[in-house]
Amino acid sequence: MANFPDSLLILNGKSADNQPLREAITLLRDEGIQIHVRVTWEKGDAQRYVDEARRLGVETVIAGGGDGTINEVSTALIQIRDGVVPALGLLPLGTANDFATSAGIPEALDKALKLAIAGNAMEIDMARVNDKTSFINMATGGFGTRITTETPEKLKAALGGVSYLIHGLMRMDTLKPDRCEIRGENFHWQGNALVIGIGNGRQAGGGQQLCPTALINDGLLQLRIFTGEELLPALFSTLTQSDDNQNIIDGASAWFDIHAPHEITFNLDGEPLSGQEFHIEVLPGALRCRLPPDCPLLR
């Protein structure tokens, strides 16, 4: 391990006092591995630290946090227009860690850290929304977005991904479907959507497999729509397989256009974006990411 190039870890401020992480980094440094550590405090820090990583000449920038941290770091990396672009390493430290979990990143800190530094760097896709923002994992709309956006931080901290489901059940009487129209390559649908998932990755909301067949290096986005007028019957019906379920609509395309007669909100790796018109397109091979050899998200 001692011959591997330098890395820079961008650590979410919520994990700054993580003692096991501090010990894992110390052990690797004792092996001769140079790991720079920078802690985020406010929005925009990740971009500044990626710029610093380039000046330092590191080969890997590690995102230490949840899906939001991974989104910030990966978005900063794909904005690099010239020179060598560092690879992305993943260190899952958030509440749900949906992208890292579905990619097969080890839960053990020391193993995840070693993979982030020394793992094979594979080209993976990202997605751009309305030419101004991006996501690496998934865009979710409807019921799922309102739940993940409104779930209290204390509940998430105490219960992790299960908190989203509990908060959703508590709010069930106020949740209504979104009327919208969705177009893609050889795809057109119009109706009432309770949940919309457009995935580069497979899961969101604390482990919910919204796009179970998505791959991150196939140049496509997977779409899944949960339809219906009433939430509770639709949720029960989704316990069946999608092949037998009239409340589930699936699609795949390099792009999707979404129009709604009223404002709807999409959650992009944890960041809300509201509007009536959305153009979502895949960015093939947008960056390199260090992944396990048996990563289920690779074709």
Curated annotation (Swiss-Prot):
EC code(s) of this entry: 2.7.1.-
Positions contributing to Mg(2+) binding: L215, D218, L220
GO biological process assignments: phospholipid biosynthetic process
Ligand binding (ATP): T40, G66, D67, G68, T69, I70, N71, E72, T95
Principal subcellular localization: cytoplasm
Entry annotated with the keyword Nucleotide-binding: yes
GO terms assigned for molecular function: ATP binding; lipid kinase activity; magnesium ion binding
Subcellular location: Cytoplasm
Domain of life: Bacteria
UniProt similarity note: Belongs to the diacylglycerol/lipid kinase family. YegS lipid kinase subfamily.
The protein's name: Probable lipid kinase YegS
Organism of provenance: Salmonella arizonae (strain ATCC BAA-731 / CDC346-86 / RSK2980)
Taxonomic path: Bacteria, Pseudomonadati, Pseudomonadota, Gammaproteobacteria, Enterobacterales
